[in-house]
Amino acid sequence: MSKLGKFFKGSRSSRARAAPSAQEALARLREIEEMMAKKQEYLENRIQRELALAKKHGSQNKRAALQALKRKKRFEKQLTQIDGTLSTIEFQREALENSHTNTEVLRNMGFAAKAMKAVHENMDLNKIDDLMQDITEQQDIAQEISEAFSQRVQFADGFDEDELLAELEELEQEELNKKMTSMELPNVPSSSLPAQPSRKAGVPSSVHRSRAASSRRAEEDDDFKQLAAWAT
């Protein structure tokens, strides 16, 4: 291999080893964009100036007007080239930014995958199954204990609750009977009943009997009301 070939090969290998980072390349592209934007603004101003000169010398000095138009055309050509260059630089910068973003995403995903792998290395599926079974069994036991506490407690005293209730009803009935038998009846008036009025002439005897029966029922109702009031 010739010395010249070795020289170019060494230059390529050195450039490959010293490849710029994405951040450095992006910074340089942004610097170029700013420089080209300033150049673009300068050319636009020069174009407007030459156009004004051409209009100024149009009728008086055609030679000066033509020179101004020529300069204007050159500046417009340069401006067109700068526009194309800026478009290319913007495209390259956007592509590099996307590549840098994808690289960062891939790197972080790989980092997360390694962390997840390290976590899973300490896990055993059999141990997890055993743990879940233990948790389920303990939950069932806790549920049974809760149900046992919530159930009615039955004391082993040998007494039947139905018999006790029946005996209680008998005692209540006896107390009620005692009250009824010891109840004092209202005093009966000792005076003799008033004499019945003499039967008027023309009034039938059935009418007198009906009035007497109504009077007795009224007295009985009064006695019953007094008895009920005393009992309550």
Curated annotation (Swiss-Prot):
Post-translational modification Phosphoserine, affected residues: 210
GO cellular component, one term: multivesicular body membrane
Topological type in the membrane: Peripheral membrane protein
Low complexity composition-biased segments: 11-23
Pfam family, one: Snf7
Subcellular location: Cytoplasm, Cytosol; Late endosome membrane; Midbody, Midbody ring
Comment text on domains: The acidic C-terminus and the basic N-terminus are thought to render the protein in a closed, soluble and inactive conformation through an autoinhibitory intramolecular interaction. The open and active conformation, which enables membrane binding and oligomerization, is achieved by interaction with other cellular binding partners, probably including other ESCRT components.
Official protein name in the record: Charged multivesicular body protein 4c
Record organism: Rattus norvegicus (Rat)
Name of the coding gene: Chmp4c
